[in-house]
Amino acid sequence: MILYKSEQRVLGRSDCLQILSQAEKDHPDAFERARDYFVAFVDPAAYYKPYPTVAEINAVNSAFTEWVLFDFDFAQATAAERAGEPLPEAPQTLVEAYAQGDATVEELARTQFFSTFWVIAQDPKRKLSVMRETRTCRDFEVSCDLISTRRNWTSGTVNARIASVGGRWVSCGRCLSHDSAPSEPQPACMTQTDPERESSRFIELVRELEGVNGRFVATARAESFWPA
């Protein structure tokens, strides 16, 4: 495990709430379109229950927050409001649009991705885990209190969003889920291949976990949290 001399700032709850609040104020129509798309695509099972639990509603809200911050193409959604202005060459997420020159947020927005990992090793004292991405077999040393302390997560796989902040990989998403189905880790790959960012990967998993017709909705034990 690597020791770091000082903590790097992580995009926290207050940062995210500030971005969401400002975006909704600046672009209410685009924000509403994002919400409508998310609800139509996921079709949350909680919305069909007469008395959903607070945890069920929080799970839906947490998933929407993570998706709209990190995966939703905000530039395309606001194109009509900026008639005559050229669109960015690549999709621009909400967190990228509102980084506002903050180097930490810009780095996080540029490097973040959501994927599936094997948890290879845990160090609870340092809140660090070695996580092997299942598609590239690349190892990441990730700072996350929750992942480092869940001993049973060394079996099966974990779905998480991570990003590099100041050269250190951190858990940056609001939603984590653990799949307990047996899965044997593949050998680590020595090449530093960057996992391909797929903006649909997160929302598709949310539909399976929380959607009314989701494959795992009956047995899902998803957790949502904000990094400290």
Task: Give residue spans per PLM region.
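Short aromatic-glycine-enriched beta-strand elements
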Residues: 125-131
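Extended, charged helical/alpha-beta scaffold domains that provide interaction surfaces
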Residues: 139-141
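Mixed-charge, low-complexity intrinsically disordered regions
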Residues: 1-123, 137, 146-228
